[in-house]
Amino acid sequence: MVVATALCTVALSGCVAPAPDDAAYESKAASTAQAALSEARTALLGVRTRADDRLPSTYLEPVLVDAEQALGEIRTTFDSVQPPPTRAADKLRGTLDPLLESAASDATELRIAARRERPGALGTAADDLAGIADELERFAQEHGT
């Protein structure tokens, strides 16, 4: 997980330059959505594995912390990209940025629920994150090449 997060961060750190046109920005947005999707699915896998009693709670917490941090970094990196001055770029950003924010927030809720050992809250947060993950997947598919 740590290696995946590091690779994701390194891969996305190259996305800080301005996007010269809509196609480049759309490509960066699709890559960002895919990276966020990967982190969200990792967190959800940890929660499901814990719910099946196949993962100790002491391991779930670091999995969730790593996903939470990675999602925050992914969002920060995407937000640092200067979009081209077009309505299409603004619309793309307006669609993806709230998804990234929700994914990061849901990952935080997962971590809090796991630390407090509240299975009901953990399940609710997992359902919320699963919905956002599905939206991230649709976004990545729609805008990927």
Which role does the model predict for each range below?
Residues 20-23, 137-145:
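Short, charged, intrinsically disordered terminal tails
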Residues 10-14:
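C-terminal motif of bacterial Sec signal peptides marking the signal peptidase cleavage site
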Residues 1-5:
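Bacterial N-terminal signal peptides that target proteins for export
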